[in-house]
């Protein structure tokens, strides 16, 4: 599907002309603009106010060098980013990603998606994203600490609890957040909720670690229930083996599903008896080892080289939880051919546009990431609330709030899709629902 509306088409063409090399960012923008056609057609005042032009252009982009010294005494230099995309509904909020693939296009796409995701939570959070091409894998704790301290030595001047509140993402877990927070506190000499995903002893929220994976399953549960189905007795395939995948495994299992396959960038494992999330957590979070190590714990499991093959494993429910554009058209065809009837995205934009189109054409229940993986940032918002109130809620309290937020996101996306004559199209429903709140705020605040 291509953009039909002349105004939206003109905005997209102008954006593509200015950013021809930023394919991930352009992909994210195109998907959203396609969904917004009926809304923009009903509101000609948006064009007069240049609303869409402002929506797709970040308010601020920060790029900086990050020099640090490795354990051999050699100076290394990486590049750091922070894209402060939109603050119409609250302070910039979004994670930091440390991975060799990180570039400006990826950070801009993530920041753009974050705007709509944060809007859907109904919490007062704008959209932003950041990171670096630094690879924490294979680095010592001391090297990671030195890098994080150097990174924050520049980033601190752009952050603040009411300005910009980063969190974790790929390559940025509790260890990295701790180092970043420590350096911020040292430089600013103040103790504020400037980062989320912190450790429990220094202002973190219970259930934050589990939130994205749990939230994904809560969203999928609602979507399945509307179709008269549930997780009970279903075969579940989860790509990835990081934070999102591990806790999606735990919650899917608690809801009655059986997770039979998981992956990392090297390959995937199949365990017909159900993959034990505790074993996966030990391998990935404690040993920081490759997924093949699962065979040392469960010799009856099978390991296959190459992560793409995971989509050929017969399943009922697929949860892509690894990285962007991992589920391509061939993977979507394999899922449909093998009887999969539900795909819910746990990673950010893990499915390519042609894969999504194929799944929708074949009647597959499809949950888009900006709605179904919003649990992480929702609980980050709850962590910000606890920090502001100087309170700490119990795990059960946070989990209940998370569950309610995910149920409301599903209902809002589904109702919005139906309102605009696209019943069941949660991609359009989530895009429009997220946009409407941001658009209303931007129109109220003038040309800024």
What are these regions (language model features)?
Residues 1-206, 437-446:
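N-terminal ligand-binding/catalytic initiation module
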Residues 2-28, 223, 336-448:
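Adenosine-phosphate binding glycine-rich loop
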Residues 12, 30, 104, 108-112, ...:
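Predominant activation on well-ordered alpha-helical scaffold segments within soluble catalytic domains
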Residues 73, 169-170, 205-212, 237-241, ...:
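Active-site nucleophile and cofactor-binding loops and adjacent substrate-binding regions
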Residues 84, 129-132, 171-172, 242, ...:
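Glycine-rich beta-alpha junction loops
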Residues 163-167, 190-195, 238, 261-264, ...:
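General beta-strand structural signal in soluble alpha/beta enzymes
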Residues 196-199, 204-312:
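Glycine-rich phosphate/diphosphate-binding loop of Rossmann-like nucleotide-binding domains
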Residues 267-366, 371:
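Rossmann-like adenosine-cofactor binding region
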């Amino acid at each position: 599907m291509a953009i039909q509306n002349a105004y939206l088409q003109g905005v997209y063409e102008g954006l593509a002309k200015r950013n021809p090399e930023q394919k991930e960012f352009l992909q994210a923008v195109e998907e959203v603009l396609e969904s917004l056609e009926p809304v923009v057609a009903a509101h000609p005042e948006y064009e007069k106010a240049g609303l869409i032009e402002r929506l797709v252009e970040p308010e601020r982009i920060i790029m900086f060098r990050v020099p640090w010294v490795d354990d051999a005494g050699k100076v290394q230099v990486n590049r750091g980013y922070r894209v402060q995309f939109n603050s119409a509904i609250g302070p910039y909020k979004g994670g930091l990603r440390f991975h060799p693939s990180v570039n400006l296009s990826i950070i801009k796409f993530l920041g753009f998606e974050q705007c709509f995701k944060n809007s859907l939570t109904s919490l007062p959070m704008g959209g932003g994203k950041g990171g670096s091409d630094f690879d924490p894998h294979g680095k010592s704790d001391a090297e990671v600490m030195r890098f994080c301290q150097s990174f924050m030595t520049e980033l601190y001047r752009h952050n603040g609890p009411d300005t910009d509140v980063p969190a974790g993402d790929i390559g940025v877990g509790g260890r990295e957040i701790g180092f970043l927070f420590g350096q911020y506190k040292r430089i600013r000499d103040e103790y504020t909720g400037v980062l989320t995903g912190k450790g429990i002893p220094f202002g973190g929220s219970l259930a934050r670690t589990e939130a994205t994976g749990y939230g994904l399953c809560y969203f999928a549960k609602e979507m399945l229930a509307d179709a008269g189905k549930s997780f009970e007795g279903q075969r579940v395939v989860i790509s990835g083996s990081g934070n999102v995948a591990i806790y999606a495994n735990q919650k899917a299992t608690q809801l009655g599903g059986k997770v039979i396959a998981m992956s990392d960038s090297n390959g995937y494992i199949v365990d017909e008896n159900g993959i034990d999330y505790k074993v996966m957590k030990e391998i990935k979070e404690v040993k920081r080892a490759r997924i093949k190590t699962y065979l040392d714990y469960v010799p009856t499991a099978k390991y296959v080289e190459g992560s793409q093959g995971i989509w050929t494993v017969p399943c009922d429910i697929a949860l892509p939880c690894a990285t962007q554009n991992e589920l391509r058209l061939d993977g979507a065809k394999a899922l449909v051919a093998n009887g999969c009837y539900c795909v819910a995205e746990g990673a950010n934009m893990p499915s390519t546009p042609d894969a999504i189109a194929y799944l929708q054409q074949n009647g597959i229940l499809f949950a888009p990431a900006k709605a179904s993986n919003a649990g992480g940032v929702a609980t980050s918002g709850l962590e910000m609330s606890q920090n502001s109130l100087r309170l700490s809620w119990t795990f059960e309290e946070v989990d209940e709030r998370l569950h309610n937020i995910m149920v409301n996101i599903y209902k809002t996306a589904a109702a919005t899709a139906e309102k605009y004559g696209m019943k069941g199209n949660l991609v359009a429903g989530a895009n429009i629902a997220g946009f409407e709140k941001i658009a209303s705020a931007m129109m109220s605040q003038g040309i800024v």
